[in-house]
């Protein structure tokens, strides 16, 4: 059994991180069907940092660092909760609670990674570097566009945005990012927005919000509800950040994270297809390619082509980056099933042999160490599962 303290600690952190999916925010999905949670919010903000073009993120290294900060920035809400900007809070008390949460959560990791992740989180909080300022800008802009996007926005949410623009943390948006200010203002005023690349990126990001109501067969840890594909994508990007050392071949972790942020966007059109379910693989492949072309086609031409190429690389499963990303995609679900009293395994009457046939080989192809770690845990559970 692969049972190293390093991997045990990493998985303890990743399983604990799943709790962020249960932290609801004041903001709502753009279809107004339910509150947005902090995990899918983090995924959406990471997409903002991936596609938006601002001076702070002009250096690819700063963009990559900003995305990592965004993946981590709200984890403290697992312990400290979300604090809506329009409500009064004791800022010192919140800062202390969040710092204590960061100490506990990152402390679950091996010491070297704990220090690395805590440094990223502290840098984001301080907002003193280009990467941190860029990450914070995305974190500030996403909720405003989120509130203004519905056909009939919620009046109280609109008022929060108006107050934010007038005297809150976005009060200098008209100076710092005038083009984005013009788009937010147009959305609030229901007047024609400026055209151009920013408009196309906003259209893409608004479309991405539709992944949040796409639910998977897998439960979140604890089994209280099904996981949606947006929060799943955030969790996988976090898996990549934490588990990159276990790739059997050299990888570019930033590209792996990008693949995992993008990989399930096609489910907006094509839906989720459970690995233990029955479906026509050829029809699924064609439907997903059509979806990818439509969704990435919302972006400016060159950027859309780049994102489509990354998605196609992931699907082809041939490069070291794609192979590791695919293996992580298969590795996450068994861990959540183990943390959910079997989760989807009971529904599909999964046996250990079924797991080996449908999942095990796919994990082992790109992450044999992870397969060695999870296999005895899965076998023990499935062999004992009532049928």
Question: Where are the regions that the model predicts?
Answer:
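Alpha-helical, largely C-terminal catalytic domains
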Residues: 1-387
């Amino acid at each position: 059994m692969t049972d190293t303290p390093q991997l045990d600690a990493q998985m303890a952190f990743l399983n604990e991180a799943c709790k962020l999916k249960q932290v609801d925010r004041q903001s709502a999905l753009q279809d107004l069907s339910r509150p947005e949670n902090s995990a899918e919010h983090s995924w959406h903000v990471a997409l903002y940092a991936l596609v938006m073009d601002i001076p702070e993120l002009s250096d690819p290294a700063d963009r990559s660092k900003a995305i990592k900060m965004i993946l981590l920035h709200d984890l403290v809400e697992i312990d400290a909760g979300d604090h809506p900007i329009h409500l009064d809070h004791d800022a010192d008390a919140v800062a202390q609670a969040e710092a204590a949460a960061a100490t506990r959560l990152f402390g679950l990791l091996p010491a070297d990674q704990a220090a690395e992740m805590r440094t990223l989180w502290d840098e984001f909080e301080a907002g003193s570097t280009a990467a941190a300022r860029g990450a914070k800008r995305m974190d500030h802009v996403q909720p405003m566009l989120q509130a203004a996007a519905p056909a009939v926005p919620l009046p109280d949410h609109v008022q929060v945005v108006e107050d934010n623009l007038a005297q809150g943390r976005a009060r200098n948006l008209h100076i710092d990012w005038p083009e984005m200010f013009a788009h937010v203002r147009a959305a609030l005023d229901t007047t024609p927005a400026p055209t151009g690349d920013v408009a196309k990126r906003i259209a893409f990001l608004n479309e991405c919000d539709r992944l949040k109501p796409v639910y998977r067969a897998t439960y979140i840890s604890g089994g209280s509800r099904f996981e949606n594909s947006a929060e799943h994508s955030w969790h996988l990007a976090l898996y990549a950040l934490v588990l990159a050392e276990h790739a059997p071949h050299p990888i570019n972790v930033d590209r792996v994270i990008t693949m995992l942020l993008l990989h399930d966007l096609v489910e907006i059109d094509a839906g989720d297809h459970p690995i233990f379910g029955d479906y026509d693989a050829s029809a699924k492949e064609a439907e997903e390619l059509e979806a990818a072309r439509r969704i990435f086609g919302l972006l400016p031409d060159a950027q859309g082509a780049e994102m489509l190429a990354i998605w196609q690389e992931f699907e082809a499963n041939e490069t070291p980056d794609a192979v590791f990303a695919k293996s992580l995609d298969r590795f996450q679900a068994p861990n959540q099933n183990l943390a959910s009293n079997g989760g989807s395994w009971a529904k599909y009457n999964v046996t250990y042999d079924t797991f080996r046939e449908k999942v095990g080989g796919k994990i082992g192809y790109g992450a044999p160490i992870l397969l060695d770690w999870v296999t005895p845990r899965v076998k023990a559970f499935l062999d004992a599962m009532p049928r």
